[in-house]
Every structure is written in C-alpha cells, then in structure tokens.
Swiss-Prot record:
A GO cellular component entry from the record: membrane
Signal peptide span: none
Glycosylation sites: N5, N286, N525, N572
Function according to Swiss-Prot or TrEMBL: FAD-binding monooxygenase; part of the gene cluster A that mediates the biosynthesis of austinol and dehydroaustinol, two fungal meroterpenoids. The first step of the pathway is the synthesis of 3,5-dimethylorsellinic acid by the polyketide synthase ausA. 3,5-dimethylorsellinic acid is then prenylated by the polyprenyl transferase ausN. Further epoxidation by the FAD-dependent monooxygenase ausM and cyclization by the probable terpene cyclase ausL lead to the formation of protoaustinoid A.
Miscellaneous comment: In A.calidoustus, the austinoid gene cluster lies on a contiguous DNA region, while clusters from E.nidulans and P.brasilianum are split in their respective genomes. Genetic rearrangements provoked variability among the clusters and E.nidulans produces the least number of austionoid derivatives with the end products austinol and dehydroaustinol, while P.brasilianum can produce until acetoxydehydroaustin, and A.calidoustus produces the highest number of identified derivatives.
Species of provenance: Emericella nidulans (strain FGSC A4 / ATCC 38163 / CBS 112.46 / NRRL 194 / M139) (Aspergillus nidulans)
Site, Transition state stabilizer: residue positions: R452
Upper taxonomic lineage: Eukaryota, Fungi, Dikarya, Ascomycota, Pezizomycotina
Pathway linked to the protein: Secondary metabolite biosynthesis; terpenoid biosynthesis
Localization: Membrane
Name of the molecule in the record: FAD-binding monooxygenase ausC
Taxonomy, superkingdom: Eukaryota
Family affiliation: Belongs to the FAD-binding monooxygenase family.
TM stretches of this protein: 111-131
Keyword terms of this UniProt record: FAD, Flavoprotein, Glycoprotein, Membrane, Monooxygenase, NADP, Oxidoreductase, Transmembrane, Transmembrane helix
C-alpha cells in the first residue's frame, strides 16, 4: 500500500483535500496511490470549499426566508401589549405632573430633543458644555417612562453589553463613575443613563410616555410645529387615555434609536395560539418569576418554553432559560457566531492607575484605540488597549468602513483573515457542544461580518443540558401556530410559553430618521424627510439637510459608523453642538432667531464624497439574509439610478476616524463653511 507521511487538518463538512486516488491489483493485493495537494493548493481548495458552503447556506436561507410580514403591533388589539411599557409604574417619577409642567412653559421650546437614550442625552450634554445653552433651554421627549433608550426597554435575564463598558458607557470621565465589570449589565447601563441626566440637570426636562407623530416647519414663524400624543401611565403603561398635544420649537434634534419597537413576524395562525406569548424587549417577569435585579425564573419550573430566534439577545437569554425551564426548545434559522467573552470585575487599583496615567481625555483615546483595531487602521496602534474579541476581528471593517476599504483586493484579503477566525468559531462550537448533530447546527457558515458577532461563555454549553432541544428551521421555517404551540418541520410542539427573540422593526434599508421614529416630517415647501432619503440623499456631514431647517439628526447615512455606537453618537452630538453654539454667537441681537441649513452646493458635495467611498462596503453583498443587508436584497435588481440613490445612503466608507478628522478640521476653520445662516427678528 502507498502511504503518505503528510498530515492535514480536518475540516468538518468539507470535501477531503486529495487530488487523486488510484487503485490497482498487484500480486493479488490492492495497491492504492493517493496524490495530495501541495500546501498552497490545499489552502486554495479549502477556501473554495468554504465559499461554496457559504453560498449554499445563503441559498437555503433565501428560499426559506420567504415573505413573512411583520404585525403592526399598535394596530392589532391582540398584540397591543407588545407596545406597552411594563416598567412605567416603577420609575419613581410623577410623569404626568412633569409633562404638564413642561407643556405649561410659555413660548416656544428653544431646543427639542426626541429620544432620551444615550443619543439624546449626549446631544443635551454637549449643548450644555458649550456654555451657550442650559438644561432649561432643552426639552426631551421619549415614549418610555425613563432614560436609557433600548436599555430602558430591554430588561431580559442575562442582559449585558458586548462592547467594553469603559468605552461604551458615555461620560465616565465627566461623571467619575467606574463600571463594575469589563462588560456591564443592562441594569448598570440604565442606571448610568439616569446618572447622566441627574448630573446635567436633565432629569426634570423630559416628557416621558410621550410620542411625537408630526413635525411641520412653519416658514412664517421660523419654528417647528410639534404634534403628538401623551400616553397613559396606568395599567402597565398601555396606550390608554391618550391625550394629544402640540408645541413649537426653534430647533429639533431627532435622536430616536433603531431598537425600540419589537418585531413580531406574522406567522400563519399566530392569533390562534392560546398560551403565553411575549417578546424579549418586553420581558414578562410576572409570568416567568424573578425580577430585573434577581432573575430567578421559578415560574418556569413546570413549563415547556420556546424561544424563536438566536441573535444577540437569545445568546444571552438561552443560558438563563435553560437554568430554570422544565423544557427549553430553541428554534434557530441562522446560528450565531459565538466567541468567548471573558468578563471580569473592574480592578479599582488598575482603574485608578489607568485613568490617572492617561489623564484628561482618557476615555475618548481608549474609544479611538478600539476603533482603530475594529476599522483596521493602517498602521495600527502599538498597544491594543481593549484587547477583546472585537479588536481581534479586523474583517468587521467590511461592514463599518475603514481606510483600506477601497483597496481593490481588500475584500479578498479580509475574506482570508475572516476565514481563519470563523474556522476557530466553528471549532469552538464543536469543542463545547457534546452532541455532534447540535454542534453541526450551531456552526455558522457565513463571513463573520454578515451577522453581529456574539460573545458569551455559557451559550453553547447550554445545549449540553438534557432539558434543552435545538430545532433547525432554516429549510422550512415555522409552518404555522396552533392553539397549543406551533408546527415546524411537520412536527407540532406543544408549548406553555413562546418567547419571540425576533429583533426590532428596523427598516430593511438605511431608512430616514423619520421612518425609524415613525414621525411624519415636513419642511419648507412641503419637502418631506422621506422624500429626501428616497430621491438621492444629500446632507451636510450626515447631520442636517436643506429644506428641513433647524432640524438635526443622528444616524449612519452619510456619517461615520463604528462598532461602538455611543462613540458615533457622541461625534454627531459634539458637531451639532458646535454648529448651534457658533450660529447663536453670530446673531445680531439676543432676540433674533437664527435659521440654519446647508447650502445646496455643500450638501451635494458631501454626498459626492460619500459616493466616492461607498464601494468600501461592497463585501456585504453575498451575505445570508438579515437586517444588515435588507434580508438578502439583490442590488443588481435595481436600476442604475436606484443603485446610486442607495449608495448615497451609505456611511462614510473610510471609517469613523477619517470622518471625525474631517469634522474636526472643518470646525477648526471656524467659518461654518457650507452652512447658510439667516436671522429672523421676532417682534
């Protein structure tokens, strides 16, 4: 027999990397000759096999994804509770009295901020820090009953942030707060939002449980007319006893996040289900038992529990459900790519030494060090300060942009780097999960940037527990619901409770701020924000656009994007605060109103800059369906004009550092170049 002394690493679910096998009879025996590939050829063949597996997986999911619509939860009485606020009665604030007091303030609001999460808070704080504005100049509005945005709504068991707390939790330097762990719990993050509000006098400046529905520019008065509804507080914050309201504001800032409204897929016969049904973003501790502070879900001890979806939220929830449920069934379409998190308590000695040694501005420098690694800057800093799974994933720059993104071979280079990382992720699943079948199902076959990477130390091992079952629905999906459960793969599962971990109603394309917030925005001459986004977007720096004067917004379209969303929001806030403060300084008198908007030429020039860099995101094509790529939307089906309009909606393709440098250089000139200022004397 012919034998080779070479050994080759195994690769599950991949073809054997052998070039030729020959067999012949010699002297009554069978002699086999195996011709193996050389190392370079082996790597190429392996890469081709992985790419083929990626494409096959994508095709399976595109066929299975189908056309499942979403239920409009505010219009279906059976699902109204998905839109309610289960925490409204526990905030310790007289929300109705505070709303009435703020509404009774005479005259127009100077600055209205829509959203009281970290985005809204950062806009408010950076405005106050200019010295031109005070907290009394600011009114904040949010549909929640407290500060925190997505961290207000999400209180499910196991909730944590997968971005390091020292860079994610804003204004640590200003508030003097030390996070308890490297990765903070949702509870701690929400408390920090409240701390910021208290520190800057904003706690009494918010109209909670209030929804803005319309913004209309009054050209004669040079103000925004704001119309909406004040929601009920009783009955767990249901949308009862709504009262309409109207106010006017000189300036409006839209800081609504993208993760507020739960996504409820309209599965066939979902209305027939008689058991308990809720969404992870509206966790029902009354049913499960436990609380936010102590999530011992003893109410599930005799229950068969299903969770649909295995994204970032489910990765954190599944280990907790597995611990307390009699039976847990996890319905999975796309497996998460789960790396280690390695959380640890903050060492006070290290904290004191680190912050003192770094001095003023330490948090911003740490954030930017993190950005350099995740955007794959060249050259990289000599020290990786955060040094975690994110900073060891340069391929994620395909999704958020980076300075090398326009290199012709960049996507190919990142595919090679990412393939090694994903191979380790796949090996990790097989090393931890004992069942070969479950391990195969939990193995991700897609580039790492196609889904949000996850980091958790207990998720995969939860599938080793005898009370946990994994159901693969990527081929056929969920067929329909029944009175007692649901049907998948022609099997009916009887369930006491179904938990939807199906994400949020994020539009499938880079939607306008008005679409994300469900607000109708109409500017000068009836120009709508929706039309601006649909018909060839042009902005100045991604924060303002012509014919919507005195209106500012946060987002990624024509602005910088990064893993650490809070850093990007802070750059938006710092920039807008500078513009507003400098515009106010130029008023001919204190009583004069200022109207701010970009010139047509400046916003079109900025759009062209964005277009020139949009090719940096070309690696997103070919991903498995998900909200990051419009659930598999095929750009080739668009007309050339539609493709250009879509490219105008992209983020700044050179990465967040390039974007910030551009803004800082623009501010350093001090001339508000590209902005048209007019002044209006109000008598």
């Amino acid at each position: 027999m012919y034998a080779s002394n070479k050994t080759y690493p195994s690769s599950r679910a991949l073809p054997c990397l052998v070039e030729k096998v020959e067999a012949q009879h010699v002297d009554g025996a069978i002699r086999v000759r195996i011709t193996t590939l050389e190392q370079k050829d082996w790597r190429q063949a392996k890469a081709a096999a992985v790419e083929a597996k990626y494409e096959a997986e994508r095709e399976i999911q595109l066929r299975a994804h189908g056309n499942v619509k979403d239920i409009e939860i505010t219009r279906e009485s059976a699902f109204e509770h998905f839109a309610t606020d289960p925490w409204a009665q526990h905030v310790g604030v007289d929300i109705e009295a505070q709303r009435e007091r703020l509404l009774a303030e005479p005259g127009s609001r100077k600055i209205l901020i829509i959203g009281a999460g970290f985005g809204g808070l950062l806009f408010a704080v950076r405005l106050i820090q200019t010295g031109r504005f005070t907290a009394e100049d600011i009114t904040m509005i949010d549909s929640a009953a407290g500060f925190g945005g997505t961290w207000y709504w999400n209180r499910y068991p196991g909730l944590m942030c997968d971005t390091e707390s020292y860079i994610y939790m804003p204004l640590l330097e200003e508030t003097g707060y030390m996070p308890r762990n490297k990765y903070a719990s949702g509870n701690e993050i929400r408390e920090h939002a409240e701390r910021i509000a208290q520190t800057y006098g904003l706690a009494t400046r918010a109209m909670f449980r209030t929804v803005v529905e319309k913004l209309d520019w009054n050209e004669a008065e040079k103000v925004w007319t704001v119309a909406g509804s004040m929601l009920g507080i009783a009955n767990n914050g249901q949308r009862d006893n709504m009262m309409s309201f109207q106010m006017v504001s000189q300036f409006t800032i839209m800081a609504s996040g993208s993760f507020a409204s739960p996504r409820v897929p309209d599965y066939p016969n979902i209305f027939d289900y008689k058991g308990k049904l809720f969404h992870t973003a509206r966790w029902d501790y009354n049913y499960t038992g436990g609380s936010v502070e102590n999530p011992k879900m003893l109410g599930l001890a005799d229950k068969t529990v299903a969770i649909i979806g295995t994204g970032a939220s489910a990765v954190q929830i599944v280990p907790q459900l597995a611990k307390y449920s009699n039976k847990l069934i996890v319905f999975q379409r796309t497996p998460a790519a789960v790396d280690a998190r390695n959380n640890c308590p903050t060492d006070p000695v290290w904290w004191e030494t680190e912050t003192q040694a770094e001095g003023t501005g330490w948090q911003k420098r740490r954030q930017e060090n993190f950005n350099a690694f995740t955007c794959n800057e060249k050259p990289l800093p000599s020290v990786n300060k955060v040094d975690d799974g994110w900073t060891r994933m340069p391929s994620f720059s395909i999704l958020i942009g980076g300075p090398q993104g326009l290199d012709p071979d960049y996507v190919d280079r990142m595919r090679a780097v990412d393939m090694n990382r994903q191979e380790k992720i796949r090996a990790r699943a097989h090393n931890i999960v004992q069942s070969e079948g479950s391990a195969d199902l939990l193995t991700p076959w897609y580039p790492g940037w196609c889904k949000r990477p996850c980091f958790h130390d207990d998720y995969l091992s939860a599938f080793n527990l005898p009370n946990v079952e994994l159901v693969d629905i990527r081929h056929n999906g969920i067929s329909h619901f029944t009175a007692n459960g649901l049907v998948a793969n022609d099997i009916e599962y009887e369930l006491d409770v179904i938990i939807l971990s199906t994400g949020y109603t994020v539009p499938v394309t880079r939607a306008s701020p008005s679409s994300r917030a469900n607000i109708a925005v109409s500017g000068r001459n009836g120009t709508t924000m929706e039309a601006k986004w649909a018909n060839g977007l042009a902005t100045l720096h991604g924060v303002m656009t012509r014919d919507l004067p005195n209106l500012f917004f946060a987002g990624t379209s024509q602005a910088g994007a990064c893993v650490n969303l809070v850093y990007a929001l802070d750059q938006n806030a710092t920039h807008v605060a500078y513009i507003l403060a400098n515009a106010f300084d130029r008023r001919p008198s204190d009583s004069a109103r200022v109207i701010i908007e970009p010139t047509p030429g400046s916003e079109e020039a900025w759009a062209m800059q964005v277009l020139q860099r949009a090719a940096g995101f070309r690696g997103i094509a070919g991903c498995t369906p998900g909200y990051l790529n419009g659930y598999g939307m095929d750009a080739s089906s668009l007309s050339p004009e539609q493709q250009i309009n879509a490219a105008r909606l992209a983020a700044w393709g050179e990465g967040i550092a390039s974007y910030v440098r551009y803004l800082e250089a623009w501010r350093a000139k001090g001339d508000l170049n590209g902005i048209e200022l007019t002044f209006f004397a109000k008598f």
